[in-house]
Amino acid sequence: MGVFGYLRERTPCHLTLLDPVDVGPEEVPEVLESLVKAGTDAVMVGGSTAHASQVEAVVEAIREVADVPVILFPNGPEGLAPNADAVLFMSLLNSRNTYYLIEAQVKGAPLVERFGLESIPTGYLIVGEWGTTVSVVGDARVIPFDRVEVIVAYALAAKHLGMKAVYLEAGSGAPEPVPPEVVRRVSGIGVFTIVGGGIRSPETARELAEAGADAIVTGTAVERDPDLAAEIVEAIKDL
């Protein structure tokens, strides 16, 4: 079936995002314990400044405590590791920098092939009205939440370029999550919709899932309060 098929079968699903810069291998068991019990569907590993050695070590630690797929969330070729199951092979569609549109992908593709990773082609969109780390590092022309038609147009571009998923990213630690109406409009075009950033409560996660999000990503909430993150997982699973 593959990892992407597994995720599609479990929608709405929950993805735990671990940034190896913030969560080291020795911290993985404690962070993941409550999330695995709550039913998180997969673990994503990566971040804006993570490097291969850090990623590989965290993936190995996850393998020891969780029997769920491990999906790479790379910041570039340096975010790839051979011991994961799959990779979100992303293009940052609203970046001003061609490196994040295609150059990083050209450098990373041979590694994906060599490592035998399942590739999930993904249109990555940074949305909102504030400067998060990912928007700064990715040199993104951030799309405000109220420009719904523009966001949908980007998502349609991803769909017609053959991408399997669209990732709506408000950014790690964002003050607000992606609004349900934006999620509703994007999921309505018939593309697998991943939503992350600013999700701090079970109620918010439930609203986004009800709006059509296929996958809900929590990262900072996981690192700060694993038990709260577990409640978010349970809220999604109760639908």
From Swiss-Prot:
Gene Ontology MF annotations: magnesium ion binding; phosphoglycerol geranylgeranyltransferase activity
A GO BP annotation: glycerophospholipid biosynthetic process
Subcellular location, principal: cytoplasm
Pathway where this protein functions: Membrane lipid metabolism; glycerophospholipid metabolism
Sequence positions that bind Mg(2+): 19, 48
Cofactor: Mg(2+)
InterPro entries, alphabetized: GGGP/HepGP_synthase_I, GGGP/HepGP_synthase_sf, GGGP_HepGP_synthase, GGGP_synth
Catalytic activity, as annotated: sn-glycerol 1-phosphate + (2E,6E,10E)-geranylgeranyl diphosphate = sn-3-O-(geranylgeranyl)glycerol 1-phosphate + diphosphate
EC numbers for this chain: 2.5.1.41
Protein origin, superkingdom: Archaea
One Gene Ontology cellular component: cytoplasm
Binding site for sn-glycerol 1-phosphate: 167-173, 197-198, 219-220
Any one Pfam family match given in the protein's UniProt record, by short name: PcrB
Subcellular localization: Cytoplasm
Keywords, comma-separated and alphabetical: Cytoplasm, Lipid biosynthesis, Lipid metabolism, Magnesium, Metal-binding, Phospholipid biosynthesis, Phospholipid metabolism, Transferase
Family indicated by similarity: Belongs to the GGGP/HepGP synthase family. Group II subfamily.
Known role: Prenyltransferase that catalyzes the transfer of the geranylgeranyl moiety of geranylgeranyl diphosphate (GGPP) to the C3 hydroxyl of sn-glycerol-1-phosphate (G1P). This reaction is the first ether-bond-formation step in the biosynthesis of archaeal membrane lipids.
Protein name: Geranylgeranylglyceryl phosphate synthase
Annotated organism of origin: Methanopyrus kandleri (strain AV19 / DSM 6324 / JCM 9639 / NBRC 100938)
